Amino acid sequence: MAGTVAVPEGITNPPIDELLKVCDNKYALVIYAAKRARQINAYYAQLGEGLLEYVGPLVETYPTEKPLSIALREINAGLLTAEPIEQ
């Protein structure tokens, strides 16, 4: 039966295998995406105040899209760079 199937977004799109090509391991990917998602969330929160301290989303977004989904798509598109921190 032919029907319409929703295109998966967020955690399932982009696939984890593609995202792991960008980061060394899945734990680094989680930290990387979470930090960027916090920046995106802070950007949306400060829009009403007129402050522009954080950079907004670098990819096209949808009104109901979560900051983590946006961050994962930015990472997959190669729009962000992460540098390891020496301890």
UniProtKB/Swiss-Prot annotation:
Q: What is its EC number?
A: 2.7.7.6
Gene Ontology biological process terms from the UniProt entry: DNA-templated transcription
Q: Report the top EC class in one word.
A: transferase
Q: Which GO terms describe its molecular function?
A: DNA binding; DNA-directed RNA polymerase activity
The record lists the catalysed reaction(s) as: RNA(n) + a ribonucleoside 5'-triphosphate = RNA(n+1) + diphosphate
Quote a single Gene Ontology cellular component term: DNA-directed RNA polymerase complex
Tell me, what's a Pfam family for it? RNA_pol_Rpb6
Paired cysteines (S-S): none
Ordered alphabetically, the record's keywords are: DNA-directed RNA polymerase, Nucleotidyltransferase, Transcription, Transferase
The record's HAMAP family line, in alphabetical order, gives: RNApol_bact_RpoZ
| UniProt subunit comment | The RNAP catalytic core consists of 2 alpha, 1 beta, 1 beta' and 1 omega subunit. When a sigma factor is associated with the core the holoenzyme is formed, which can initiate transcription.
What is this protein's function per UniProt?
A: Promotes RNA polymerase assembly. Latches the N- and C-terminal regions of the beta' subunit thereby facilitating its interaction with the beta and alpha subunits.
Q: Its family?
A: Belongs to the RNA polymerase subunit omega family.
Write down what this protein is called.
DNA-directed RNA polymerase subunit omega
Protein source organism:
Acidothermus cellulolyticus (strain ATCC 43068 / DSM 8971 / 11B)
Its lineage reads: Bacteria, Bacillati, Actinomycetota, Actinomycetes, Acidothermales
Record gene name: rpoZ
